[in-house]
Amino acid sequence: MDVYEGKAKKIIPLDDGKVIMEFKDDATAFNGEKKAQFRGKGWLNAQISAHLFRVLEASGIKTHFIGVAGDNRLIVERLKMYPLEVVVRNVVAGSLKKRLPLEEGTELPEPIIEFYYKNDDLGDPMINQYHARVLGVGESELKEMEKIALQVNDVLRKYFAERGIILVDFKLEFGKNTRGEIVLGDEISPDTCRFWDAETKESLDKDVFRFGKGDLISAYERLYERITGEAPVRR
């Protein structure tokens, strides 16, 4: 079984229907044009993802998370992944402000769901249900992903709000397990979400690196401490 290495993670298959997901210290932005390494980033993303998966599981949302397998490793259920990214937006930011005549920071009257085709060569283009069908993803599967994505949003938006954080937007990925269930996969971390401090509107996510807003590790550590109630130990 081959090890897959992406920009931010290694996927190491095991022979018991499980996978090791190893988080790297690498940071990339703008489709890999900007790159750097930050010691401790992998640990922070692994621990934040594990914590948020537990929050979702406690709310009845099925994920691929099984447990923590070391500082920067999670054990997860092996899934047959869909070639899609599902983006949920609560506040105008990022690419959305270029597509709608709304100011950055405007709270949306309801969440916006977007689908993107995962393909680096094509720049991960936005697609609709017709494109998805051509890619082999049925309408019922899309509706199930959308339903779960909105459930995730309801749980996490409330969870973060209680901790003084705005969940601006986030990316999810889904796969199908051996029982034919559509399950939340990948990660939920400041690499894949936009988090703003509710008072200052400071970024607590990868935008800190993307736009040179400050120290990435400090931002991730602040997020970790807010959501877990524990001070992180520098790695």
Curated annotation (Swiss-Prot):
Species for this entry: Thermococcus kodakarensis (strain ATCC BAA-918 / JCM 12380 / KOD1)
Q: Superkingdom, according to UniProt?
A: Archaea
Q: What class of enzyme is it?
A: ligase
* Keywords attached to this entry: ATP-binding, Ligase, Nucleotide-binding, Purine biosynthesis
- Please name the GO terms of the biological process aspect recorded for this protein, alphabetically: 'de novo' IMP biosynthetic process; cobalamin biosynthetic process
Molecular functions per Gene Ontology:
ATP binding; phosphoribosylaminoimidazolesuccinocarboxamide synthase activity
Q: What is its EC number?
A: 6.3.2.6
The record lists the catalysed reaction(s) as:
5-amino-1-(5-phospho-D-ribosyl)imidazole-4-carboxylate + L-aspartate + ATP = (2S)-2-[5-amino-1-(5-phospho-beta-D-ribosyl)imidazole-4-carboxamido]succinate + ADP + phosphate + 2 H(+)
Q: What Gene3D superfamilies has UniProt attached to this entry?
A: ATP-grasp fold, B domain (3.30.470.20), Phosphorylase Kinase, domain 1 (3.30.200.20)
InterPro entries (UniProt xref)? SAICAR_synt/ADE2_N, SAICAR_synt_PurC, SAICAR_synth, SAICAR_synthetase, SAICAR_synthetase_CS
The pathway is: Purine metabolism; IMP biosynthesis via de novo pathway; 5-amino-1-(5-phospho-D-ribosyl)imidazole-4-carboxamide from 5-amino-1-(5-phospho-D-ribosyl)imidazole-4-carboxylate: step 1/2
Q: What is this protein called?
A: Phosphoribosylaminoimidazole-succinocarboxamide synthase
* Gene behind this protein: purC
| Similarity remark | Belongs to the SAICAR synthetase family.
